[in-house]
Amino acid sequence: MSTTKGTSPNVTSNYTTCKLWQIICYSMVPAVGNFFMIVFTMNAYIAKGGYGLATALAASIASSGKLFDAVTDPLCAVLVPKMRSKRFGAARPILAIGYLMMAASVLGIMFVFPGMGIVPYAICYMLYILGRTIHNQGKNIASNLITNDPKQRPLIGRCSQIYTMVLAMLLSLYRGKILFPIFGGLTFELLQVIGVTCVVACLIMDLLAMFALKDCDTYESVMAHYRPGVKVKLSDMIGMLRHNSAFVTGVISDASDKLANEVASAAVVSTLVFGVLIGNYGFSGNISIYTTITSVVLIFFITGVAKKIGAGKAYLRYTWLATGVAVAMFLFFLFGDYTQISVKPLPTAIFVILYSLLTASKSTTNAAVVTMYHDIADYEFYLTGKYEPGLVVATITMLGKIVSAAGGMITAALLATIGYVDNVPQPGDPATQKVFWITMLMWLGMMIMGWVCSIIAMHWYPLTAEKMVEVQAANKIRKQENLAAQKAAEAAAAAK
C-alpha cells in the first residue's frame, strides 16, 4: 500500500493507492457473491426438483428472503464492523464467515435436506441470505481500505464485472453445452453439480482476495476511520436520507434497478426466451462468448470514462444506452421472426448484436454503480465524520431489497397467467402469443421501467469528479486526526 499522488510517488497526496495485482485479486470478492446468487436464482428448479414445492411457494420463500435480507443488512452493518482483529484486520474475518455460511447453505439445500419439505429448504435459503449479507459487509469495508484513488476505484468495478461476466459465460456453457446433454434437462442432479462447482470456485476466489488485502486490512488502517466516542447507529440511516442527496439518489436508482433485474434475471425468464420463444435453449450458451467479449470492451471504455467525468455521469450515460438497446430488442422481437434466431443468418446476427449490447450495457452500469457506492460512503464521512460504508451501502440495498422483494411475487404472478402455477417453464414448451407478451414484459419491460426511474433520479446526484477531489482532501485530514486521537486514547487507557 502507498499514499502517492498520481504518477508522482514521492509527493504526498490525499489518496490511498494499491498495486494493480491487489485490485485484480480483490475484485474477485463481488464475483463470489454473484456466483452464489446465480445458484439461488434457480430456486424455482431447486424447490421443485429437490423438495416438490410449487413455483408460487418457492417464489413466496424467495420474497420473504428479500425482506429478511433487508432487515439483516443494516443490523449487520452496525454490528459486523465491530469485529476487528489486531492480526487479521476487519474485512478478512468477515469475508471468511460470510463465505462459510453461503457454502453451508448450498451444500445443505443440495445434498443434506432434499425431500424433507419446506422448513429445511427455507432455513437453508435464509442462511444463504445472512451469509451473503455478512460477506457484503466485508466487501464494503475492504473497498474503502484498499484504495480511494479516483483513477483506481473504477478499476475495481471493471475487474469485478469482468469476473462476473466470465463466470456467467462459463456457467452458461457448462450448464447448456456439458451438463444439459448429460442430464437431459434442468434436473436437480444438474443443479447439484453446479452447487459444488460454486462452492469450490468461490473458495479459491475469496482466498486470493484475502491475500490481496493483507497489506491494507490492518488494525491501524481500520482505526484511522473511527474517532473515539463516535458510534455508528441504526438511526444514522434516517440522517443520511435527510442530509445526503447522493445517498437519496442511490436509493432510488438501486431500488428501481433491483426490482427490474429481480424479474428479468430469473432463470425461468432465460428458459422462456431461449427454450420456448427461440426454441433452442443451448443457443444461450453458444452466444455467451460474444456477449462477454462485447461487455469486456464496453466495461474497459466506461471505466476509462468514469476516471475522467466521474462515476455518476458515466452511470447516467450508459443507463441511457441500456434503455435504448432494450427498446430496440423489443422492436426486433415484435416485428421480426424470432423463431428463426439460430436458424437463419440475418435474424441470428441481429439478435446476437442486440443481446450482446444489452448484456454489456447492464454490466457497464453495474460497474459504475460499484464506484458510486464508494463515493457516497466517502461523502457521508466528509459530511458527518462517521465512517460507515457498510451502513451506507446496506441502507441503499436494504430499501432496494424491500422493493425488489415484490420481484419474486411479480414473476410468480406473471407465470401463473400463462399456466405455470405448480410447474416451471421447460425448453420446448408451446410459444403462444400470451407467452410472448408475458416474456417480453418480464425480460425487457421491467428493465426499461427501472432504468427510466434511475435516469430521472440521477439528475440530483451531486458527486462530480471535481467534488470528489474536495471530499478526499478533507477526509485525509480527518483520518490523520482520528488516528492521533485513537493512539492518545489507547495511551491514556494503558497509563491507568
Q: For each predicted feature, which ranges?
A:
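Membrane-embedded alpha-helical bundles of multi-pass transporters/translocases
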Residues: S2-K487, K496
